[in-house]
Amino acid sequence: MKRIIAIGAIVLSVGFVAMGQFHYAFYYDLSAGQDLEINLINAMPWTNDVSMAVHDAYGEEIWSMTGELAGYEPGYVRLGENIASDSLHWGVVTVDSSDRLIIGLEYFKDGLLISIDTVYSETPVLNPNEQFWLGTYYTQVGDAETAYIVMNPWASIASCSVAVYDANGEPIYSEDFVLGPYEAEYVRLEDAVGSGGLVWGFLDVSMEDVSVIIAVEYSGRGCSGLEIDNVTEYYF
């Protein structure tokens, strides 16, 4: 049986947040029948302290918890058991820990498991004027659709630029974002670039000073409703 880390909102202590050495972030959605189970796995042989905070689309904290995992122990939280469904209950979840974690994510829609993802890379702290890039695949071919979510996992303002290139490497879309603390933005590429035989390829995100993360939702082309991938590995 899975061990439940916490079954209620616990106020985060300032002391614990200050001692957190590892910072992770990923996407959740509790709107339109969706849910998320978060599996936190201690990758170390000693005790690992963890804290989690869930933010709505505007960056407001709506739920938080703290817990402790013994060496190599897993624990899980089902967000829908602690947070009500709401049109604004989507965006970024942040996890701070005293040592390394592996985070398994099980996404549900209408009670059915639709996607599994794993997050193991920390969200980096950038130096002033330091640039970073995230990149991923998108497709708008046939009945395929891609949406991306850009999220700020920090308590400070973050900015980034998103560029989309077609199959010939030509730029077909770009947008700049300024995100408040823990704020998220959702963009359907159908609205931004339409669809077509050459509308697939590279989605690039550049940032400076403060790091962001993205998630991508794929539908169509045989997907079982929805495929959700978090993009947290920075390529440069």
Segments the model singles out, each with a brief description of its role:
Residues I4-G15:
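Sec-dependent N-terminal signal peptides
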